Amino acid sequence: MTQTFDPSAFLATCSGRPGVYRMFDAEATLLYVGKAKNLKKRLASYFRKTGHAPKTGALVSRIAQIETTITGNETEALLLEQTLIKEWRPPYNILLRDDKSYPYVFLSDGNYPRLSIHRGAKKAKGRYFGPYPSAGAIRESLSLLQKTFQVRQCEDSYFKNRTRPCLQYQIKRCKGPCVGLVEPEVYAEDVRHSVMFLEGRSNALSDELNATMEKAAMALDFERAAELRDQVALLRRVQDQQSMDGATGDVDVVAAFVNPGGACVHLISVRGGRVLGSKNFFPQVGIEEEVGEVMSAFLAQYFLGGIDRELPGEVIVNVINDDFPAFVDAVEELRGVEMVISHRVRGTRARWQQMAVTNAEQALTARLANRQHVASRFEALAKVLGLEDPPMRLECYDISHSSGEATVASCVVFGPEGPIKSDYRRFNIEGVTAGDDYAAMHQALTRRYSRIKAGEGKLPDVLLVDGGKGQMSMARDVLNELQVPDLILLGVAKGTTRKAGFETLYLNDAAHEFTLPGDSPALHLIQQIRDEAHRFAITGHRARRGKTRRTSTLEGVAGVGPTRRRDLLKHFGGLQELSRASIDEIAKAPGISKKLAESIYANLHSE
C-alpha cells in the first residue's frame, strides 16, 4: 500500500451515492469508518484546508488509502457502518465500551416461584421483567421485593434440599416455602403482588393492600394488618423515590453531553411507566466531538450493536441529528420495532429529559475531576522518583492464599487517567511450596514478563511490589534473568505499626529505603494501587478456593467430568448434601448409573 494519498485523484472517481467509507494508514490499519448520504461530498469535506478540529486534522494526516462501499440507501449504510465498527473498533470512531447484555428480573414457574437476576437468552420457563440499565438497579428492586413480600430468591437446587429454614427466614426475608412454613395460596398471593410491582402497577398494588389491611383490622386480625401496613409503607417510600413516574409505556431517555475533556451519555430506562434505573456511558470520543454526532453514534451502537436488547417504543433525546430518520428505519428493518425519537417533550417527559441532561453533565464533570486528581498524584510520584515526566504506566503485584491453598497472584495496571482494567491479570500459582510468597511472586513475574518480552503486552514504567526487601530482591532477580530493559522498581512494605500512612518504600534496590509524609499525594497513589492489587488478588483467590472445595473431591472419579460434576452439585444443592446421599439417591440423579453412583459414594467416603 502506498504511503502517499492523492485526494484530488480519489475524489475524481468517487461516487455521489449513499455508502460507507473506510480510511487506512500506511500500514493498512483501519483508522476510521463513516457513512454518508453522498460519499463524494462527505469525503471532500475532509480535505478542505481550513475549519478542521485537531483530531480530524490528525486523522487526515495519516490517510494512505480510502475504500468505499455503495449502498442502496442511508439505512443500509448505517447498518453496514455499525457492523464494521463493532468488528474492527477503529481508533478514530466513537466507541461504546459497554458490551454486556442487560439484566432482567426472572420469575420462574412452579408452585413456589423464585425471583432472580437473569442475563442472556430467555430459555427458562417463566416471566421476564426489564431490561434494567444496571445490576445495581435490579438488586434494589429484588431487595425491596424480598423485604416486602418475602418471595424466595435461592437456587432451585438449594431450595429442594433444605431440611430446615435458612437465615433468610430468620431475618424475615423469606417465608420458608422450602420446609412448608407457608401455604401455597399465601405464597401465590405474594408472587402476584410482586408481579404487580414489577409491571409498574404500584398505585393499584398500594390500593389493594390498603383495602386488605382495613379488612384485616375490621376482623381484629391485627398481626396481619400490621404486616400489610409495613408493606404499604415500603411501597410508598419507593414511590416517593421514583418521583419521575407519572406516565405509561416503555421509554428510554438519553442525554449526551460533550466538553473538551470527553463525553458522557446518560440513559434512564422507563418500563410500564416505572423508572427502573439509569446508567452513565463514557464513549471513547473519536473525531466527531459535536454532541449530535456523539448521540447518533451512541444510539446506533447501543440499539443496533448486536446485543438482543428489548427495545422501547420511544426514545427521548436532548439533541437531534440528521441521521435519526435512517436510524429509525434501521431499527424497524433489523429488529421489527417501530421506534419514535422525541426531542421536544412536555410534562413528565420533559422532567425525565432534564434529569438525564443534568446527570450527564454532573457525571462527566466528576469523572474529569477525578482524572485530574489522579494525574496530579502521578505528577507527585514523578517528583518522588526523580523523573522529568510522570510515568504513563504502573503495574502492581500481590499474592493471596489461605495457608498456601489456592494461591493466586494479581497484576493491576494504572495510568494517569486511573485503573486500566482491561490489562488486569491473575495468575493461578502452581508447583511452589505452600505459603511461599517469594516463589509465588517469582512465578507470577516470570510468566508476566516472559509474555511481555514475547510481544504480548506493554512494559510498565514503574513496577510496584507489595512487600519488603525480600520481594524487592526477588523481583530484581526476575528482571535480570529475563533481561528486561530498565524500569523503576518500587517496593512498599507496611511499617512497624502496620497502619496506612506509615509505609516504608524501597526504590530500585533494597538498600534505598525511605518514607513519605502521610498526606503525600504520591503515597496516596501508591496506597491506592497497592490496595487495588490486594483486592483483585483476594477476589481471585476466593473464587479459586471455592471452586476447588466444591469440586476437588469428585475430580478423581472416572466418568465424572466438569459438566457432570456441576450437574451433580446442582442436583443435590452442594457437596455437603451430596456427601450425605446414599448410593441409591446418587443413582437417581440425571445421567448417573448405579455403578457410577457406587464409585462416587466410595470416593466421597474414602477417608
Curated annotation (Swiss-Prot):
Q: Which GO terms describe its molecular function?
A: DNA binding; excinuclease ABC activity
Q: Name one GO cellular component term.
A: excinuclease repair complex
As for subcellular location, the record says:
Cytoplasm
Q: Name one Pfam family in it.
A: UvrC_RNaseH_dom
Q: Give the UVR domain ranges.
A: 203-238
Q: Which GO terms describe its biological process?
A: nucleotide-excision repair; SOS response
Q: Main location per UniProt?
A: cytoplasm
Q: Which residues form the GIY-YIG domain?
A: 16-94
Top-level taxon of origin: Bacteria
Provide the alphabetized UniProt keywords. Cytoplasm, DNA damage, DNA excision, DNA repair, Excision nuclease, SOS response
Q: List where this protein forms a coiled coil.
A: none
**Keyword Cytoplasm attributed:** yes
The function of this protein is:
The UvrABC repair system catalyzes the recognition and processing of DNA lesions. UvrC both incises the 5' and 3' sides of the lesion. The N-terminal half is responsible for the 3' incision and the C-terminal half is responsible for the 5' incision.
Similarity section: Belongs to the UvrC family.
On subunit structure and binding partners, the annotation says:
Interacts with UvrB in an incision complex.
- This chain's protein is named UvrABC system protein C
